[in-house]
């Protein structure tokens, strides 16, 4: 079991499906306390849809729901999962036609695992086939809160694509307001919606709501502070922005993206130039292959008129 517990905290890859199957195994063998211990280590905000829904089921003692969608003893279910993994691989390579082909085979063998249809919806969305997306989304019902929220988010994104951000935000707002005691992950998603639509004041309010619920040294808190700090920065409230970003770095001083964001903000304001350059160099050392950070350090040298160094990165 320690192997699966380590997977939960592994930041190098997505092992969420393995953890789901482990939970399924534990519940099938009536090891409910072990299953509870596993989900205690899962954070809703950083988890995938499948793991968030699994954690919710266990938190609500809905253990039977696991067996309703998958059984390790059913050969069709096992082959279906193998086909789903192939489909997921093709999707990651933007080969949506082959991805959907294997997904259809997977769904044929195990139609109970309707959550897998979220990948079909994503494939069709990326191909701008919004009518097909809408039909698939109808499979996700209110009782499965995270997949239902995925449905609402995707419907809002379609409205944004077909109309505009304003109507998309109105839609997601109206649906969110009908949710009783929304999970912290749902609040986080809503805050990100606001930030992406440049509704920074609303985003800040929601991020603040989340921050107040998190432990002081949580890495998730660092991420939310980063997002709120970025919202303040976009509004021109640099004092609040710096406060949040520095707080985030006290929690996680090796986060290259926070270092990069704060340093570049300072350089643009002609503020703490030497310290900003040091932070950018640290960010580059941490993520030397990241195009975003390479571009930032190149422009930073350009801003301080060190054109020879800038040319190495730009």
Tell what function each PLM region has.
Residues 67-82, 215-222:
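TPR-adjacent "capping" and linker segments in tetratricopeptide-repeat scaffold/adaptor proteins
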Residues 4-5, 39, 103, 137, ...:
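Hydrophobic/aromatic packing residues within the alpha-helices of TPR/SEL1-like helical repeat arrays
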Residues 18, 51-52, 116, 150-151, ...:
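TPR alpha-solenoid repeat register
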Residues 12-13, 47, 111, 145-146, ...:
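Short coil turns that delineate tetratricopeptide repeat
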Residues 24, 88, 122, 157, ...:
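Residue-level recognition of tetratricopeptide repeat
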Residues 29, 93, 127, 162, ...:
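Structural motif corresponding to the intra-repeat A-B loop/turn of tetratricopeptide repeats
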């Amino acid at each position: 079991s320690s192997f699966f517990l380590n997977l939960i905290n592994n930041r190098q890859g997505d092992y969420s499906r393995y953890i789901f199957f482990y939970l399924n195994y534990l519940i099938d063998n009536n090891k409910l306390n072990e299953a509870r211990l596993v989900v205690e280590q899962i954070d809703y905000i950083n988890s995938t849809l499948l793991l968030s829904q699994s954690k919710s089921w266990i938190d609500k003692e809905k253990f039977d729901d696991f067996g309703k969608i998958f059984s390790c003893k059913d050969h069709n279910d096992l082959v279906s999962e193998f086909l789903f993994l192939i489909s997921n691989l093709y999707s990651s390579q933007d080969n949506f036609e082959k991805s959907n082909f294997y997904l259809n085979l997977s769904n044929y063998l195990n139609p109970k695992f309707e959550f897998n249809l979220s990948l079909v919806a994503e494939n069709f969305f990326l191909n701008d086939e919004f009518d097909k997306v809408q039909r698939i989304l109808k499979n996700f019902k209110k009782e499965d809160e995270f997949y239902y929220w995925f449905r609402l988010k995707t419907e809002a994104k379609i409205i944004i694509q077909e109309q505009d951000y304003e109507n998309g935000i109105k839609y997601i707002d109206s649906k969110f307001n009908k949710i009783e005691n929304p999970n912290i992950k749902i609040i986080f998603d809503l805050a990100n919606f606001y930030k992406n639509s440049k509704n920074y004041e609303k985003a800040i309010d929601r991020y603040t709501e989340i921050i107040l619920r998190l432990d002081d040294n949580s890495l998730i808190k660092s991420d939310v502070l980063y997002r709120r700090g970025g919202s303040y920065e976009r509004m021109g409230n640099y004092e609040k922005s710096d406060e949040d970003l520095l707080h985030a770095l006290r929690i996680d001083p090796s986060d290259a993206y926070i270092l990069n964001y704060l340093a570049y903000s300072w350089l643009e304001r002609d503020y703490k130039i030497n310290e900003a350059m040091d932070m950018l160099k640290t960010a580059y050392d941490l993520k030397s292959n990241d195009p975003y950070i390479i571009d930032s350090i190149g422009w930073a040298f350009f801003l301080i008129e060190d054109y020879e160094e800038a040319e190495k990165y730009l």
